[in-house]
Amino acid sequence: MCEGPSRISGPIPPDPTLCPDYYRRPSSAQGRLEGNALKLDLLTPDTDRDLDATPPRAPRIRPGGLEILERGRRGVGGVLLQLGGISLGPGASPKRKDPKDHEKENMRRIREIQRRFREQEHSREQGQSRPLKALWRSPKYDKVESRVKAQLQEPGPASGTEPAHFLRAHSRCGPGLPPPRVPSPQLTLPGPSAKAPGPGVDFITHNARTAKRAPRRHSRSLQVLAQVLEQQQQAQEHYNATQKGHVPQYLLERRDLWRREAEARQHSQPDPAMPPGHTRMPENQRLETLSSLLQSQSQLLRELVLLPAGADSLRAQSHRAELDRKLVQVEEAIKIFSRPKVFVKMDS
């Protein structure tokens, strides 16, 4: 089926048995890529062995090649699945460590600390005592003698041979005689003929009369309950007198706030009756203008009344006509500014 050697070249060499003469390689290449040709017998003719008289070299193997080969035979599953020193492979598992005994460790450390402390105490006791630091003393007392030293140097009145008589413990330190004791009265049992001292008293009648006059005392719990009920009654009376039926102060404040907000919204909204290009005159300015117009009207009327009735000159007639015209204008302005809303044209 194959017609001659293949012309396709690639990384995988073709089968050398198809065309042995064409695909023959040197011994070095055969040992490195295809294995030893003499061992694999890929080239069947014996005449090919004489072509290269040099014996082929053994394949080069790295130092870890045997380990890799053994690992491939056994598999790597046991190595990957070693859990806590327990191997799943055929190899022997390592020895497990015994759990640490913390109690023994703590006792050992405590004994060591105690031993060290005892050694320090022993060394401190054997060491020489340190000299005491002298207390500070003012230089002005250098020439003053010690009173204790002076008392010790004075000779005592008693000789050294005579023993000193000192008070001993639990000895009497007062006078030699004990203090006189008041004799206690002896109780004598009354005889059958003895009478009770004093007049006879009827204690039963006395106790009954005292019990009637004594006030009745209640228990502590009943007194506390009465005080609590009285406080509740006073609180209810105060509530009925001051708060019941009255609107709370916070509701009144909230009502005023709502009213001011509504007025502000109403003022901020444009008036539908206002013509375009106009603005509403403020209320205080409208009232001031109206008062000035009323004063002007009263002044013009006074001037008109003071005119002479029989004056028919041209000047008098023109002055009367001027006053009438001003009065008409003032009356028209009074009618306009007497309205609740006055719109003024804005300056363009």
Curated annotation (Swiss-Prot):
Subcellular localization, as worded in the UniProt entry: Cytoplasm, Cytoskeleton, Microtubule organizing center, Centrosome; Cytoplasm, Cytoskeleton, Microtubule organizing center, Centrosome, Centriole; Cytoplasm, Cytoskeleton, Cilium basal body; Cell projection, Cilium
GO biological process, one term: establishment of mitotic spindle orientation
Top-rank lineage group of the source organism: Eukaryota
Residues of the Enkurin domain: 253-345
Region Disordered, residue ranges: 1-65, 84-195, 262-282
Compositionally biased region (Basic and acidic residues): 95-127, 139-148
Any single Gene Ontology cellular-component annotation: spindle pole
Pfam families named in the record: Enkurin
Principal place of residence: cytoplasm
Modified residues (Phosphoserine): 93, 138
Statement: the UniProt record of this protein carries the keyword Transferase: no
Molecular function, one GO term: microtubule binding
Keyword terms, alphabetized: Cell projection, Cilium biogenesis/degradation, Cytoplasm, Cytoskeleton, Microtubule, Phosphoprotein
Assembly and oligomerization: Interacts with alpha-tubulin. Interacts (via central region) with CCP110 (via N-terminal region); competes with CEP97 for binding to CCP110.
PANTHER family linked: ENKURIN DOMAIN-CONTAINING PROTEIN 1, ENKURIN-RELATED
Purpose: Microtubule-binding protein which regulates microtubule organization and stability. Promotes the stability of astral microtubules and facilitates the proper orientation of the mitotic spindle. This allows the oriented division of basal keratinocytes and contributes to epidermal stratification. Required for the assembly of both primary and motile cilia. Destabilizes the interaction between CCP110 and CEP97 by competing with CEP97 for binding to CCP110 which promotes the removal of CCP110 and CEP97 from the mother centriole and allows the initiation of ciliogenesis.
Name assigned to this protein: Enkurin domain-containing protein 1
Gene name in the database record: ENKD1
